[in-house]
Amino acid sequence: MTELPDNTRWQLWIVALGFFMQSLDTTIVNTALPSMAKSLGESPLHMHMVVVSYVLTVAVMLPASGWLADKIGVRNIFFAAIVLFTLGSLFCALSGTLNQLVLARVLQGVGGAMMVPVGRLTVMKIVPRAQYMAAMTFVTLPGQIGPLLGPALGGVLVEYASWHWIFLINIPVGIVGAMATFMLMPNYTIETRRFDLPGFLLLAIGMAVLTLALDGSKSMGISPWTLAGLAAGGAAAILLYLLHAKKNSGALFSLRLFCTPTFSLGLLGSFAGRIGSGMLPFMTPVFLQIGLGFSPFHAGLMMIPMVLGSMGMKRIVVQIVNRFGYRRVLVATTLGLALVSLLFMSVALLGWYYLLPLVLLLQGMVNSARFSSMNTLTLKDLPDTLASSGNSLLSMIMQLSMSIGVTIAGMLLGMFGQQHIGIDSSATHHVFMYTWLCMAVIIALPAIIFARVPNDTQQNMVISRRKRSL
């Protein structure tokens, strides 16, 4: 890093700033949801669309971000990403209704979807290959600090100012980042193949419509027949994409990816697994505030052990997988996460609050081990010609499944919380207890998929990639 020219180091700082903004936003909002609900006159049990709208937009836009950067230039797209994210933040802060807030989050999601992948692409283009790992470590470090800082910062801003400030703090940072990008970042472009617009539209429509159909009756008052039509339309769009990809060699995601058994199993397991684990960052702060009466600040502080556990486990997960194998690790962590989730609910409802940080630390560790194992299992056996496409598809599936998870969590809260409930009341406890029990079942189900993974205790993605590059 020290050998790099000054202008390159400044460019890395710009990318790191974008990573920080995006990662901070993914965690800072959850703590503020109950306060947003009160301000907007909505039930706190129906605020999940604020999260879903952002994550789903990121999932939809991810496949286009790399192509746009290659075609239009990394500087232009990164600049546009920061501007859109900052404008979205401003409109979020100015929102007076839930629908306005959801639309503003969609705009924010368009910027967020381009920020991280285009940032990675920028690092690849401006840094020599020998220093790429050090540069990526540098720019992703703020992305690890964001989730650690987000819940507590969100709690402080909500408790001592207002929820609007969780979005307003992005504006000065975004202005500085946009100006620095325009002035300092080179605009690399390369020749690209034709973008698969029909495939992109089919996938985007399918993902958006299916997610909407999951919870349209509760959040938007859509009739059951209309929901059934939406579900059928979304499924048809996905099937049409599969037919399109089968006939087109230039499809967005080649069906040849699924000729690799570990990729197919890993992708299916990642999709199902992240539906369950995607509920936890949304449900935990809402449960602590609405279910137990915690202040926003204290609820935010409670999330820090979970992030610390996740960061700590990343250092040893490779050794664990090499020792026990993917199948044992994935089955054990999947069932373990379900048990830890039930333990968290039990400890909280029993009033043993002093144990909550320890349980959340354990939850973060188990979840991190499962995430890392799912990612490497999915990609480890792909040929080099398909590795980039497989990684893009995995990233899209990760975001999609998390949006579905939050949608299902909101649907469960709405289903069990039909009557008006008060903070830290017996009725509220029952609503969250039933919701958490259903969540534990959903979290545990992917163990059935992971039980089919080959028991390859000696194979590891890092090892195979190194061998392949020699």
From Swiss-Prot:
Please tell me where this protein is predominantly located.
membrane
What family name appears in the similarity comment?
Answer: Belongs to the major facilitator superfamily. TCR/Tet family.
Instruction: Identify its membrane topology class.
Output: Multi-pass membrane protein
Please report the organism this UniProt entry assigns to the protein.
Salmonella paratyphi B (strain ATCC BAA-1250 / SPB7)
What the entry lists under HAMAP family is as follows:
MFS_MdtD
Which CDD domains is this protein grouped with?
Answer: MFS_LmrB_MDR_like
The record's GO molecular-function terms, alphabetically, read:
transmembrane transporter activity
This protein is called Putative multidrug resistance protein MdtD
Among its keywords, does the record have Transcription? no
What residue ranges lie in the Periplasmic compartment? 1-11, 70-76, 125-137, 186-196, 243-262, 307-341, 417-430
* Membrane topology, Cytoplasmic segments: 33-48, 98-101, 159-164, 218-221, 284-285, 363-395, 452-470
Transmembrane segments in this chain: where?
Answer: 12-32, 49-69, 77-97, 102-124, 138-158, 165-185, 197-217, 222-242, 263-283, 286-306, 342-362, 396-416, 431-451
Entry's localization field: Cell inner membrane
Superkingdom of the source? Bacteria
Kindly give the Pfam families that the UniProt entry links to this protein: MFS_1
- In the UniProt record, which is one GO cellular component term? plasma membrane
> Which of UniProt's keywords are assigned here?
Cell inner membrane, Cell membrane, Membrane, Transmembrane, Transmembrane helix, Transport
Cite the PANTHER family for this sequence.
BLR6921 PROTEIN (PTHR42718:SF46), MAJOR FACILITATOR SUPERFAMILY MULTIDRUG TRANSPORTER MFSC (PTHR42718)
